[in-house]
Amino acid sequence: MAHTVKIYDTCIGCTQCVRACPTDVLEMVPWDGCKAGQIASSPRTEDCVGCKRCETACPTDFLSIRVYLGAETTRSMGLAY
């Protein structure tokens, strides 16, 4: 089951995670609730391969993805889904 995950509090809107993703899972979307005015969102979680390049690219060390291979992939980016 896929779901959108948004990063609110510590996302600085740098887009490094978006550029690092080899499967184009992440995108920046407008968001008035953070300082940068945009946040990273993952509308295509079903395409995530669990490489963690986005996590490595994140300069605030906030982005975290846990991938459990099997029937369902579970992801956590620090906030509720």
UniProtKB/Swiss-Prot annotation:
Residues involved in [4Fe-4S] cluster 1 binding: 11, 14, 17, 58
InterPro entries for this protein: 4Fe4S_Fe-S-bd, 4Fe4S_Fe_S_CS, PSI_iron-sulfur_center, PSI_PsaC
Domain of life, source organism: Bacteria
One Gene Ontology CC term in the entry: plasma membrane-derived thylakoid membrane
GO biological process, one term: photosynthetic electron transport in photosystem I
Matching SUPFAM superfamilies: 4Fe-4S ferredoxins
Record GO terms (molecular function): 4 iron, 4 sulfur cluster binding; electron transfer activity; metal ion binding; oxidoreductase activity
Principal subcellular localization: membrane
EC number(s) reported in the record: 1.97.1.12
Group of enzyme by EC: oxidoreductase
Function noted in UniProt: Apoprotein for the two 4Fe-4S centers FA and FB of photosystem I (PSI); essential for photochemical activity. FB is the terminal electron acceptor of PSI, donating electrons to ferredoxin. The C-terminus interacts with PsaA/B/D and helps assemble the protein into the PSI complex. Required for binding of PsaD and PsaE to PSI. PSI is a plastocyanin/cytochrome c6-ferredoxin oxidoreductase, converting photonic excitation into a charge separation, which transfers an electron from the donor P700 chlorophyll pair to the spectroscopically characterized acceptors A0, A1, FX, FA and FB in turn.
HAMAP family from the UniProt entry: PSI_PsaC (MF_01303)
Protein name: Photosystem I iron-sulfur center
Lineage of origin: Bacteria, Bacillati, Cyanobacteriota, Cyanophyceae, Acaryochloridales
